[in-house]
Amino acid sequence: MSLITRLLTASSPLRLRAMETMSRAGYSSHAKYAEHRPIDKIRNIGISAHIDSGKTTLTERILFYTGRIVEMHEVRGKDNVGATMDSMELERQRGITIQSAATYTLWKDTNINIIDTPGHVDFTVEVERALRVLDGAVLVLCAVGGVQSQTLTVNRQMKRYNVPCLAFINKLDRMGSNPYRVLSQMRSKMNHNAAFIQLPIGVESNCKGIVDLVRERAIYFEGEHGMNLRLDEIPQDMRVESQERRQELIEHLSNADDTFGELFLEEKPFTEDDIKAALRRTCIKRTFTPVLVGTALKNKGVQPLLDAVLEYLPNPGEVENLAFVEKEGQDPEKIVLNPARDGKDAFVGLAFKLEAGRFGQLTYLRCYQGVLRKGDNIFNARTNKKVRIARLVRLHSNQMEDVNEVYAGDIFALFGVDCASGDTFTTNPKNNLAMESIFVPEPVVSMAIKPNNTKDRDNFSKAIARFTKEDPTFHFFFDNDVKETLVSGMGELHLEIYAQRMEREYGCPVTLGKPKVAFRETLVGPCEFDYLHKKQSGGSGQYARIIGIMEPLPPNQNTLLEFVDETVGTNVPKQFVPGVEKGYREMAEKGMLSGHKLSGIRFRLQDGGHHIVDSSELAFMLAAHGAIKEVFQNGNWQILEPIMLVEVTAPEEFQGAVMGHLSKRHGIITGTEGTEGWFTVYAEVPLNDMFGYAGELRSSTQGKGEFTMEYSRYSPCLPDVQDQIVRQYQESQGLGQADKKKRKN
């Protein structure tokens, strides 16, 4: 503390102001949160990261400092209350976030809508949904773990939706924390043009505060829960480093921003406002990532992070949101939605999440244009169904606040709206508007599921109906071959969570079978077909002929199915073409080699023939069935399997054992790195070989190793693996035994 500050503190009754101390009361407001605000006073942000990086703890601190909650609770707190945003009992028990939760709060008279998202890879669709409707994000990184597998996934998702972000290096208080290593990983692994705008004053148990490089001041967090901020001079032993890091920040900004670059070349001194303006411009354009530091658990660095959200992340008016106008026979026309909060344009909103609440189905929406009031009618652009708005609510985790109207930029919820995730709503059905939908990854793991008691079947059906509607990555189907019900999802944890929710929320205990991999079947090369379906034995008959070719799609599209109508003339009348496509898609549900779905195939219908009386859509559908059976016999087929990106971290002495086990599981090592007695290995391993790996890793590393994995792509199986899958399928169908009998005879 400087001498002048000390004298002022001792002598003046206004000593808090002299120390430039700020309490949360000066920042937050207990005014009505849902009141209408100008567009520059709104931020829509998400908090995303790898599992256990401290996202939910950070959100809890944000809500506390902004006056939204009166006391803080920890994620796995001893008081058994749990974090505010983890409202589901399972979330509090496991200490993980399963669903993204929405809330809103006020900071310096700005309304901040926050979505806290899961970090676990099995719930990645929750992150997709959140990022689709946000204008900015806070990417939380652990000061020890650094850039981990799910961090890279979230980074890819942010890139897909062009979401500007701030990076917050959390957990400075942990043993082994090294924010400088995390910054270098951000640059090397994530290709971010990133630099510190804050530095830690000490790490681990010596974490005292932070240095603000933009304002060139030290910030200390004092009082109960770090509510009072004291600004002081930068400590003597950090001045050289602070100057060097500030210069580094200026150089990175000058490379990313032309206006700032000109000032840099002219060698003019930079003001605080120059740097802040450049940070805002580059952050919104995604050409630079400001890096902040702190420890949410120890209440340090959260208030400056909130300031940065206001200063550097965009308001809804600074983000360009597009919609597509469907035109018959033409490509959709792109139009830019008007973000002004004046209600002059027709309402346009996107449903990004469905949830069955206590009062019926809850639909989360983001308003992109216009205004929506209670009593208005809106139309679903996909189904054209009309819905009357009886109730509008804003959400705070699992609590609600009724509002009379919402404007462009607001996140809100409706009751009783029948729709799907990614549906567009508008007040003018003639607009033909549709917004870009949400990317949904394919499920990779299936398990057999059945209720323990037959009397619970009704509740089981209700639970399945609700969960499949809420979560597009959770699928349910009945397998006729083995006569069992199956659920599919993004991983074992994903399916286990739903099984537990069935018991807790519906009183329906269920049994899950062993996990099964979602293999796919595809063609190796093109295969032509010419099939005639003819059934004319008196009365109305059936006649259809189709000619064409089935061919593989490129490897990067091997999870898709395509149908192309290349017919010219009237040999195959246009009204019968949908029948051919329907037959193709029906047959694609079950392949010949292993009974799994077909994928990565293009069906090209080139020619055919019809009968003036006996042809029908049904006849052409059956012709497609026959043509595909013909291709099953004549084509070369192979099985595709899901490949996972696996990241294993363990003490150095176990490196050989870990790499040996991954190789044994047909893994391909893609990289390794080591720090301070620990190593991390990155590999690509078939999902089929990863079952049981958790136990093996625990036993081979004395319980010290941990791993994460996420879906990467589908790739052809090894020949011996394919032979084994085909043999097992044939035996399950009784084909193997029949062949053996034939051979004996």
Curated annotation (Swiss-Prot):
- Residues that, per the record, bind GTP: 49-56, 116-120, 170-173
Claim: Mitochondrion is one of the keywords in the record: yes
The record's subcellular location field reads: Mitochondrion
Q: What coarse category fits the chief subcellular location reported for this protein?
A: mitochondrion
Superkingdom field? Eukaryota
Query: Would the keyword DNA repair turn up in this protein's UniProt record?
Result: no
* Transit peptide stretch: 1-15
Recorded GO cellular component terms are: mitochondrion; nucleus
Please provide the record's keywords in A-Z order: Elongation factor, GTP-binding, Mitochondrion, Nucleotide-binding, Protein biosynthesis, Transit peptide
List, for all copies, the residue spans of the domain called tr-type G. 40-317
Among the GO molecular function terms of this UniProt record, one is: translation elongation factor activity
Q: Which GO terms describe its biological process?
A: mitochondrial translational elongation
Pathway where this protein functions: Protein biosynthesis; polypeptide chain elongation
Per the record, the similarity remark reads: Belongs to the TRAFAC class translation factor GTPase superfamily. Classic translation factor GTPase family. EF-G/EF-2 subfamily.
Q: In UniProt terms, what function does this protein have?
A: Mitochondrial GTPase that catalyzes the GTP-dependent ribosomal translocation step during translation elongation. During this step, the ribosome changes from the pre-translocational (PRE) to the post-translocational (POST) state as the newly formed A-site-bound peptidyl-tRNA and P-site-bound deacylated tRNA move to the P and E sites, respectively. Catalyzes the coordinated movement of the two tRNA molecules, the mRNA and conformational changes in the ribosome.
Name of the protein described by the UniProt record: Elongation factor G, mitochondrial
Give the source lineage, highest ranks first. Answer: Eukaryota, Metazoa, Ecdysozoa, Arthropoda, Hexapoda
Name of the encoding gene: ico
